[in-house]
C-alpha cells in the first residue's frame, strides 16, 4: 500500500502570514459582470450590457463601438476550441445567413474567454414560432428556404456541417424573407450534441455519431418543408393522437412517415374539414397540390428513399435550383392577396384556365410575365429579377438587377426599375428604342423588350 495522502491543516492553524496569503487569493468568477469592459482579441473594447436567456446562462448582450453583439462565455474552454474560434473569426462567415463568430473577448476578472457573434434583428422570428403561428406570406418563406440552401452549400465548402441544430436555431424575416442560422458552437464542434430530435436523421438516432453531409441534408429538407408549408413534414394523421408541442415532433420524427407519401397512408395529411386545428397537415394540402413538380419531387425523394438511404437525399444545390424556380413562380391572388404558384404545366392541362386561389378559391388573375432565355418569370408587385436570370452561367442567388412596383397613384399600373448599375436598352412594342438607366423605372407593357446584356427579356401580359 502507498503512503496515506497528507492531511492539510485547517486555515486557523496556519501561521498569520501564510493564512493571509491563502485568504487573499480570490477565486476568479466564472462569468463577466454587467457593466464590465472586455478586451477584444482583434482590437477594441466591448461593454457587457445585459445577460441573455436564463439566469446563470453564459450568454450576454454586449456593445462595441460599432454595434451590439451576442457574447457566449466559456469559463473552462478546451485549448482547441479557442483555435477553432480564432480560425472561424479570421476567415469570416461563409454565408450572410449565418450568425457567425466575429471576435473573441477576455475579462480582467472572469476566467476563460467569450466569443462574439451577430444578434438576429428584432424583425426575425424563430422558425419554431412559424409552425404554431398564423399563416405567413409564402414568398418570404420560400426566399428564406433558398437562403438556407445557399448557407448549407457555403458551410460544406468551408468544411463545416449543420451539427446539433434545432428549430430554435433558425430565424427568418416574415417580410423580407432573409434567414439567419444560429448554433455556431455546434456547427464548429465546440459543443457536442445531437440537437433536438425533430431535425435528427434516422441513422443518427440512438446516440450514434454521424459525420458528413448526409445528416445535414435530412435536416435541411425538414427545415425547407417547415418554412414553405408552415408545417412539420411527419405530422399527419399520427399527430392527432399526440399532445401538441416539441415532444410530439420528436416522437413523429423518431419513426418518420411523410404526410404526402402516397405509399404510406397511415400518416396522410388530414383535411381541415376533418381536423379544424390543422395539426395533421390540413393547411398544407392546397399548397402541396399546387407546388411545382420539381420541389415536390425533392421532398418525396428526401422523405421517401432518403429516409432509408442517406446518399439518396437531395443535395443543397438541387434545393437551391428548385427553390429559385419556385420563387420566380409566385404571385398574389387579386382577391385575398395569398401567394399562388404559376405552373405552366398545370395551366396547359387546364386549357389555359388560371384555376382557383389556394386560399379563397376564387378564380386567379394571371400576372404579367417575362421570358428571359429559358426562364419564365412572373412579375407581380414586389418581385425581382436576379442576376442569375440575365447572366449566363451564374449560380442562383439573391442579387437583384430589377424590381417591380406599383405606380404610387395608380396601383393597377406596374413598372420595372433598373437597380443593376448598368444601362439597358429597351424596345417598345412599336419598335422604338430607348435606354433604361440605373435607378429609372419603365411601365410594364405587353411586348416590351429589355436587353439586359447577355439576355433579352420580353414582357407578356
Language-model features and meaning:
Residues 22-67, 94:
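ATP-binding glycine-rich phosphate-binding loop
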Residues 99-144:
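Conserved structural core of kinase catalytic domains
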Residues 152, 156-174:
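Catalytic-loop of the protein kinase fold
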Residues 182-187:
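Activation of the activation-loop gatekeeper triad in protein kinase-fold domains
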Residues 190-207:
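Conserved activation segment of eukaryotic-like protein kinases, specifically the C-terminal portion
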Residues 216:
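Conserved catalytic-loop aspartate of Hanks-type protein kinases
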Residues 224-296:
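Conserved C-lobe activation region of Hanks-type protein kinase-like domains
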Residues 427-461:
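C-terminal boundary/linker segments immediately following FHA domains
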Amino acid at each position: 500500500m502507498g503512503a496515506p495522502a497528507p492531511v492539510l491543516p485547517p486555515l486557523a492553524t496556519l501561521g498569520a502570514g501564510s493564512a493571509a496569503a491563502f485568504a487573499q487569493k480570490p477565486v476568479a468568477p466564472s462569468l463577466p459582470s454587467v457593466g464590465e469592459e472586455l478586451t477584444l482579441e482583434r482590437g477594441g473594447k466591448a461593454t457587457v450590457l445585459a445577460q441573455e436567456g436564463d439566469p446563470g446562462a453564459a450568454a450576454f448582450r454586449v456593445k462595441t463601438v460599432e454595434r451590439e453583439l451576442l457574447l457566449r462565455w466559456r469559463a473552462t474552454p478546451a485549448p482547441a476550441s479557442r483555435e477553432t474560434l480564432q480560425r472561424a473569426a479570421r476567415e469570416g462567415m461563409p454565408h450572410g445567413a449565418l450568425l457567425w463568430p466575429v471576435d473573441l473577448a477576455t475579462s480582467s476578472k472572469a476566467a476563460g474567454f467569450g466569443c462574439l457573434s451577430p444578434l438576429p434583428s428584432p424583425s426575425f422570428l424563430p422558425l419554431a414560432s412559424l409552425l404554431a403561428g398564423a399563416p405567413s406570406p409564402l414568398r418570404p418563406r420560400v426566399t428564406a428556404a433558398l437562403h438556407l440552401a445557399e448557407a448549407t452549400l457555403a458551410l460544406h465548402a468551408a468544411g463545416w456541417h449543420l451539427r446539433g441544430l434545432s428549430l430554435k436555431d433558425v430565424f427568418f424575416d416574415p417580410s423580407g424573407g432573409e434567414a439567419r442560422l444560429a448554433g455556431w458552437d455546434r456547427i464548429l464542434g465546440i459543443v457536442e450534441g445531437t440537437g433536438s430530435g425533430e431535425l435528427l436523421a434516422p441513422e443518427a438516432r440512438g446516440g450514434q455519431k454521424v459525420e458528413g453531409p448526409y445528416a445535414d441534408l435530412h435536416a435541411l429538407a425538414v427545415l425547407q418543408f417547415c418554412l414553405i408549408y408552415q408545417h412539420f413534414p411527419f405530422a399527419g394523421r399520427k399527430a392527432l393522437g399526440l399532445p401538441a408541442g416539441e415532444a410530439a415532433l420528436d416522437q413523429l420524427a423518431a419513426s418518420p412517415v411523410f404526410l404526402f407519401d402516397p405509399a404510406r397512408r397511415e400518416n396522410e395529411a388530414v383535411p381541415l374539414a376533418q381536423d379544424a386545428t390543422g395539426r395533421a397537415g390540413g393547411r398544407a394540402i392546397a399548397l402541396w397540390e399546387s407546388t411545382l413538380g420539381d420541389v415536390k419531387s425533392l421532398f418525396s425523394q428526401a422523405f421517401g428513399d432518403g429516409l432509408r438511404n442517406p446518399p439518396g437525399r437531395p443535395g443543397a444545390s438541387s434545393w437551391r435550383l428548385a427553390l429559385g424556380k419556385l420563387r420566380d413562380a409566385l404571385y398574389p391572388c387579386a382577391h385575398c392577396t395569398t401567394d399562388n404558384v404559376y405552373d405552366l404545366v398545370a395551366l396547359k392541362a387546364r386549357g389555359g384556365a388560371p384555376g382557383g386561389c389556394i386560399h379563397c378559391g376564387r378564380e386567379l388573375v394571371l400576372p404579367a410575365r417575362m421570358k428571359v432565355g429559358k426562364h419564365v418569370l412572373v412579375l407581380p408587385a414586389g418581385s425581382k429579377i436576379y442576376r442569375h436570370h440575365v447572366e449566363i452561367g451564374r449560380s442562383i442567388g439573391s442579387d437583384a438587377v430589377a424590381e417591380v412596383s406599383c405606380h404610387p397613384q395608380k396601383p393597377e399600373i406596374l413598372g420595372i426599375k433598373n437597380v443593376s448599375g448598368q444601362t439597358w436598352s429597351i424596345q417598345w412594342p412599336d419598335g422604338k428604342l430607348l435606354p433604361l438607366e440605373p435607378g429609372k423605372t419603365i411601365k410594364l407593357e405587353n411586348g416590351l423588350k429589355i436587353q439586359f446584356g447577355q439576355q433579352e427579356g420580353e414582357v407578356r401580359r
